[in-house]
């Protein structure tokens, strides 16, 4: 029995020593996995009522949220965790016994002011009447995501609003930090995972990571950081997207076959084999050299063999890589990207027509016309057309009104 307990102690110690994280930045816009399609608005101001509030607004000093259960099995740094709480300063911790919430003033990670077992978007602040932390679970077992969303939050020391989330993913035990919506121009944050006071995994640029999302309330402009448990593989090309145009003119063939790839490995990628097939046909493979894709960055890979379609029509294009740096790809299931392209004989360029209705009896119309004219003057000539109609209202209407406009 003593020998079994000793062996168990050794195994658990090995798990603890080997547990770690690495992170990859997203290179395409949107939410991780596409499960959360909700719009990003304040609580009570457009946010779906399916979210549950876990904090109170108006936190002039940092406060903790309520303690919440994770709705599925989840490991942090190799050990099971079941509950969490969140500070209004942007820190989620699995150490629910932590007493003092982190300061609104961000710092470098690791930091003695951050509890062990924490995920940080440090530099957020919740003093406003709309600054509320909410939670929601998306998807179905065993691939659910639990979102903790800082809705309509402040960036400490800035007069602006910003929206961020921390996401826990079932089965993979991945943690995502999602940059969702932002009006800040000078705010920055300390983003990362703190295991303890001596160990942290941070996003490059911390504690001064700037938001990348715009004011768009949809996920279309979202950006995220993916924290992955375990050791980073040495060679791992991750397919982002095929970058061939959606529509191709047959007479312009042959076409370069290109795709964007993220280097998810620890080694810089200097060579690889590029492959593509059309409509599931015979693969076209060729070696690509002269690459220089640093770890955590993206680049476009161009296949040495161009494609000449046989005729107009719709084609399914599959592009994948293999043999990065002359070695086996350590994670081959993320190498492939697909796209449908349409080959046509010609393309007609269409210019939008803008119709404007105005009148000399309309007070706001004069400044609006001035603004509109200035805006149109910034556009490229020939890219648009507009027509202005003089109207019979309000009041007696414009003296230049004609019945054709009515």
Model-identified regions with their sequence ranges:
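Short, solvent-exposed loop/turn and secondary-structure capping segments
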Residues: 95-98, 159-160, 365-369, 375, ...
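Residue-level signal for well-ordered, solvent-exposed loop/turn and beta-edge residues enriched
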Residues: 20, 79, 174, 267, ...
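Extracytoplasmic Ser/Thr/Pro-rich, glycosylation-prone low-complexity segments
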Residues: 19-236
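Active-site-proximal beta-strand/loop segments in catalytic clefts of secreted hydrolases
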Residues: 149-153, 179-181, 355-360, 389-393
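Local sequence-structure signature of Cys/Sec-based thiol-disulfide redox active-site neighborhoods
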Residues: 346-389
């Amino acid at each position: 029995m003593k020998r079994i307990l000793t062996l168990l102690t050794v195994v658990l110690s090995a798990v603890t020593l080997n547990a770690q994280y690495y992170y990859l930045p997203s290179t395409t816009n949107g939410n991780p996995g596409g499960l959360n399609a909700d719009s990003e608005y304040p609580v009570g101001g457009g946010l779906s009522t399916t979210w549950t509030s876990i904090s109170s607004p108006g936190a002039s000093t940092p406060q903790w949220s309520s303690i919440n259960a994770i709705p599925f099995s989840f490991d942090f740094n190799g050990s099971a965790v079941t509950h969490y709480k969140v500070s209004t300063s942007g820190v989620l911790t699995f150490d629910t016994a932590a007493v003092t919430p982190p300061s609104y003033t961000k710092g470098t990670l690791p930091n003695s002011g951050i509890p062990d077992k924490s995920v940080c978007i440090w530099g957020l602040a919740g003093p406003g009447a709309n600054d509320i932390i909410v939670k929601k679970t998306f998807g179905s077992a065993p691939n659910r995501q639990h979102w903790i969303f800082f809705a309509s939050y402040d960036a400490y020391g800035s007069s602006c609003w910003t929206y961020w989330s921390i996401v826990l993913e079932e089965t993979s035990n991945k943690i995502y930090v999602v940059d969702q919506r932002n009006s800040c121009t000078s705010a920055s944050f300390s983003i990362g995972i703190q295991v303890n006071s001596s160990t942290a995994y941070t996003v490059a640029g911390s504690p001064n990571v700037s938001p990348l999302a715009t004011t768009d309330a949809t996920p279309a402009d979202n950006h995220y950081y993916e924290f992955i448990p375990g050791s980073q593989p040495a060679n791992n090309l991750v397919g982002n997207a095929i970058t061939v145009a959606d529509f191709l003119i047959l007479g312009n063939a042959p076409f370069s076959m290109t795709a964007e790839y993220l280097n998810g490995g620890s080694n810089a990628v200097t060579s690889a084999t590029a492959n593509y097939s059309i409509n599931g046909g015979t693969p076209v493979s060729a070696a690509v050299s002269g690459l220089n894709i640093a770890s955590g960055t993206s680049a476009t890979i161009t296949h040495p063999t161009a494609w000449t379609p046989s005729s107009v029509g719709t084609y399914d294009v599959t592009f994948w890589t293999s043999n990065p740096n002359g070695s086996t790809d350590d994670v081959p299931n993320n190498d492939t990207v697909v796209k449908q392209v349409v080959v046509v004989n010609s393309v007609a360029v269409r210019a939008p027509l803008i119709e404007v209705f105005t009148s000399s009896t309309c007070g706001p119309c004069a400044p609006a016309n001035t603004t509109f004219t200035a805006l149109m003057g910034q556009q490229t000539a020939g890219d648009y057309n507009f027509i202005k109609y003089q109207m019979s209202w309000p009041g007696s209407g414009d003296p230049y009104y004609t019945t054709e406009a009515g």
